[in-house]
Amino acid sequence: MTIERTFSIVKPDAVKRNLIGAIYRRIEKTGMQIVAAKMLRLTKEQAEGFYAEHEGKEFFDELVAYMMSGPVMVQVLEGENAVVRYRELMGKTNPEEAACGSLRADYAISMRYNSVHGADSPESAAREIAYFFAEDEICPRPVE
């Protein structure tokens, strides 16, 4: 059993539609635990820094503006194979291609307003977690 951490964002469109609780319930239903969470309003510098790998791409400016358009929830998830399991729960980036019952199939408005973000690898998860959380802000919970 490989217990790992992953990083997740509930994006502005989902926060605006009061979907935080519904998304958290779905995460916890999979057996993963939310071990850190906070609500933020991203600055331009934070959004650009977080999505720096996309700088220069045609969608970069729109993505940054979208992520600054309202509050987001950032959280650290922990569980067995958390990166892969959370990506499966999210579904494909394009909600029209996302599996029925996935977060994006159920909650996304469009490919641009796709409600959630998740790290794509354990390495990305570690980098993204460190971008928003100090280690002492993460509170592992015992598995019962």
Curated annotation (Swiss-Prot):
Location of this chain's protein in the cell: Cytoplasm
Q: What is its main location?
A: cytoplasm
The superkingdom listed in its UniProt entry is Bacteria
Active-site residues, as the UniProt record annotates them: 117
Q: Which GO terms describe its cellular component?
A: cytoplasm
Could you tell me the EC number(s) of this protein? 2.7.4.6
Subunit note:
Homotetramer.
Entries under HAMAP family matching the protein: NDP_kinase (MF_00451)
In its UniProt entry, what is this protein called? Answer: Nucleoside diphosphate kinase
Its lineage opens with:
Bacteria, Pseudomonadati, Pseudomonadota, Gammaproteobacteria, Vibrionales
Which gene does this sequence derive from? ndk
